[in-house]
Amino acid sequence: MKVVELSGGVGGARLARGLAAIAAVDLTVIVNVGDDESNHDLHVSPDLDTVVYTLAGVEGEHGWGRRQDTFVTNEELDRFGLDNTFQLGDKDLALKLYRSQRMRLGDPLSEITRSVLSFFAVDTPVLPATDDRVRTEIGIEGNEWLSFQNYFVHRQQEDEVRALRFEGADKSVPAPGVVEAINGADAVVIGPSNPPLSIWPILAVPGIREAVAAHRRVAAVSPLFGGKALKGPADRVMASLGLPPGNEGVAEAYLGLIDSLVIDTADIADADTIAGVEITAIDTLIGDTESAAALSRAILGL
């Protein structure tokens, strides 16, 4: 069974690991690059790296970065008085150095990611949504616009999100294989990532939304538990952008795209407020591979 997952960071990465663990599933993961940013002149792809590290089984204890990493370089950057808010572990830094060197030589992000997957012995294809520069920008009070990492890391998601824009998206094209994977899939799954901040940037790349909307079988997994995000500001961002509360807001965020929505059993009352899509209530907490695989089987009916 060919499956495509649209993924942001930790939640989507954990679901990807569960999908990849099912022998009957031939998985391709398409990942958000709206969070990508330059840090100390290095190209950082947070969501791509989180997905790769998780599939390789080397992700950090919080779901991002590398397991048992050290931070000697960061300590030395502090010595020189450099802005060190966005911390990168030493092992993680090595990947950023490799990617940045390849990009300076003109290699596309998708090609570099294939090489990184081979270094970590990951067989699952992981594709950036685009090789072009697309950046999520956050509109806040006072008509000020922030880069994603400024909002998320430096300002700790404290600003109310008034608007979003995806700079460069209108001129971008899908990375090689992205639309083909969606068109050839038996099912498309939208992972339990933040809908506006992690999935909308993928859909903003011309051709991807259209391919998903045309697909006969698209399921989304809600990132909410008891109406709240387990991690991150998903519930607050959806509310401040005018989406309805709870899983009704998740369904509206994907209006015209999904056939079914998978919600946690704690939110089963939301099923009465959602029209037009099939609702499945199941335990959606995926802390390990086994629970992620069980959720994946339920989504796919395996």
State where each predicted segment sits.
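Electropositive, gly/pro-rich neighborhoods at or near active sites that engage anionic ligands
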Residues: 21, 31-166
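Redox- and metal-dependent alpha/beta enzyme cores, enriched for Fe-S-associated oxidoreductases
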Residues: 203-241
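A short helix->loop->beta-strand "cap" motif at the edges of active sites that frequently abuts
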Residues: 24-25, 214-218, 277
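Short Gly/Thr/Asp-enriched flexible loops that form oxyanion-binding sites at enzyme active sites
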Residues: 16-20, 198-211
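Active-site glycine-rich loop that binds ribose-phosphate moieties when present
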Residues: 162-182
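Extreme N-terminal starter segment of soluble prokaryotic enzymes
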Residues: 1-4
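C-terminal functional extensions of proteins
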Residues: 231-302
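Short internal beta-strands
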Residues: 28-32, 217-224, 260-266
